[in-house]
Amino acid sequence: MSDCKRVYRFGTDAQGTCVTEGDKSMNFVLGGKGANLAEMSRIGLPVPGGFTITCQTCVEYSGAGNVWPEGALDEIVAAEADLEARCGKKLGDASDPLLVSVRSGAPFSMPGMMDTVLNLGLNDDSVQGLIAQTQNPRFAWDSYRRFIQMFSNVVMGVDADLFENALTQARLVAGVRVDSELSAEDLQELVETFKGIFSENVEAALYPELEVVDGKPVFPHDPELQLRLAIQAVFGSWMNERACIYRKQHGISDELGTAVNVQAMAFGNKGETSATGVAFTRNPADGTKEFYGDFLVNAQGEDVVAGIRNTEPIADLKTTPGLESAGEELERVFLTLEDHYRDMCDIEFTIEQGKLWMLQTRVGKRTATAALRIAIEMVEEGLIIREEAVNRIDPAQLDQLLHPQFDASKKYEALASGLNASPGAAVGEVVFSSDDAVARANEGHKVILVRWETNPDDLKGMVAAEGILTSHGGKTSHAAVIARGMGTPCVCGVERFHIDAAEKVVRIEGSDRVLREGDVISIDGTQGIVVDGAVDLVSAELTGDLDTILSWADEIRLDETDGHANHVRVNADNPEDAALALEFGAEAIGLCRTEHMFLGDRKNIIQSFILSDDETVKQQALADLLKVQTEDFLAMFKTMSGRDAVVRLLDPPLHEFLDNPRELEVAITKKEAAGASEEELAVLRTRLRRIDGMVESNPMLGLRGVRLSVVFSDLPLMQVRAGATAAARLIKEGVDPRPEIMVPLVSITAEHVQTREVIERVIAEVSVEEGVELNIPVGTMLELPRACMVADEIAHHADFFCFGTNDLTQTTFGFSRDDAEAKFIPLYMHKKILKDNPFETIDTAVLELVRMAVEKGRATNPDMHFGVCGEHGGDPKSIKGLFNVADVDYVSCSPYRVPLARLAAAQAKLEAKRSA
């Protein structure tokens, strides 16, 4: 027998003494749900007793091909017997049965992703015991039919719609509108119907444990078998599609496994003094300090999140007849939990005939807006300190605050309203299924997923959609919780929308308007409204709580007490981006890609320079480019007055500025067919020959970067002259321009040395011409492994290093980014060959090259500064490594990633202090 403990108890014994064996620190052992059930038990909250099967058991079971580890089943049987003794009831007992729930619980919160079974232990005998115990036949038969339905779907994979259709038919026959109006006799008949559905749709060969009658499997009668199959199903659900999608989205390892929680049932469906609900200690949408959530009278827990019936607000619980005392106790529990966890808590509870039971708590998911407000107010309340507040905000979540909103200056009329379930606005075409959402999105269409209510199988469509709209469900429904977690705008509970997914239409109560697939609508998840047609959207502004958190973050990241500050710059190619980045808190420009200034109308000018044989034409093109580029730099440097602006010389191969040769070939053929003159055709053919002559077989490793400065020096030197001239003129105007020139794609020290000599000569010429002393640093962009290896040599001749981690990743791996991401990186990640996409999160080997180059450069030239301007400069995970492992001075990212980078840089500083 294994020495590994696989089962942990929680709750009290028959005498009320706590026998809990775990606590909240054990989430990797017991899963988040199990650890928090143990913690609530330890602090004296009312928790139904139970036991937790460890995550490691799931890992070993799955890893062995769904074979139980040695001794595991024996421990589970012993835990069952212990729970029966504690509760004074027995599973399957015909007089006073113990019923249990079986729930998953991963180490990290995965709301709605995993499967649950309630009322396990019911069979034809124990249902009679439940009737005798409760004197409530309707409740007993309702519990039994729910169990068969859940067990058949979750454990055996029977289509849930088969049961819903039978339930609908039962309502029609009985002449009632809702399930709660069905009689005990109706429900007893439904139990037999559900058993028949089970027998007709379960393959006996797949489940040799099941009894077979007339070739059909019989619904399992033995509670021991029910429990074992349910636990195995929860283990199996860890690798189902929707769980894998969620983990991939949130960076959760597939190798953690899930725990299983077996817990005595508390019934919220025992009549009008019973209820079930989901609540938060604060508002998870905006952070308001108020009790927030939904409850349903005479219902079971899954009814709330499934959105089957519209819920009541938690504030009404204290005034609901028969539930007043439980409502008051729940508010006291809210305060206890928040004080204990020092965070907003998400709670599931059941009230059984006036008695409150806590079924779950966890640190609650929240919108970015709510996260900021809660963190700030908890600092003000003395629950946490500023550093902890900064550490609690997920940098990636700040993207939510930058989501578009409806343009307030434009008029629009709401077609319908619902609940403001997840903030932000979205515009898109109506689609009615997850598959259609994915298909249309892949074709380049923006879509709004419109559903009666979502379920976990809709996740891929929710990910693909710009926004989500449901006609049912509350603010804690599946749609609301998942949308908030993804930062996707969502409006729930739009009751005027009567959705017919089969016909793909929405009929709107009180309106003649009928929405069909492909119609465009706009939704505002902040206001909870739906608008017919497209509404203009505007970007959100950084104000209020975000400014407060980011100001705290800046204080932390710019602190030089324990080393250099963690600076944040921006990649900006025009004054508009630069100005926006300053609003977002960028300190300087870390990368200005000058080639972007040659696009649009200016493309013809650079094409004249590249393709012409006439030296006069080439020089005129250079003069024209010098003029427009000088104007660009004047605007850029003026915007960034007093701040560094790193200007990268021309980097891409020249053919990127030319026409596509194959498209030009087609155009020539068409002109020939149309009878164009030989003179016109000759010009085009000459152009095609020149372009073909410039095509390289591997252009990204060809004539580009510093190699252009060596082979075709006129173009990059024109850029140096433009930058120096702009700086000189601004100095004379009293502006403080601070340009820095960066030489790209250097791999050989002599490349940089020779290019720097020419750059300095041009700067000196401009200084004399303009009568202004210029001091423009010249640095190197390290994008190749060889450059990192000889960084100490290059550092003798460079004022700074900036790492282009996009190309450094390509050349370290030997990957072509576009090809790799399109063709095999997703497969590599699926097969766990790669943990992350190395173009999104910096690879350890690439990070080591950066670290080594920084170390070499700093040893040679202690006054150098070091930065990163690749995509990794905006990735929170990469930012921590770049500062704490590679020891760079700054990261540079796109304007909209600047707030995220500021926060991540502060968190990197805090992490470094903790590990010092």
Walk through the language-model features, giving the residues of each:
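Short alpha-helix capping/helix-loop boundary micro-motifs
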Residues: 336, 504-511
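Short, compositionally biased
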Residues: 382, 531-551
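Short, ordered loop/turn segments at secondary-structure junctions
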Residues: 52, 56-58, 454, 473-475, ...
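Intrinsically disordered, low-complexity regulatory segments
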Residues: 435, 495-497, 547-553, 573-575
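Conserved alpha/beta-domain cores
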Residues: 103-104, 542, 554-916
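Nucleotide/phosphate-binding sheet-loop regions of phosphoryl- and nucleotidyl-transfer enzymes
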Residues: 1-413, 439, 445-448, 455-460, ...
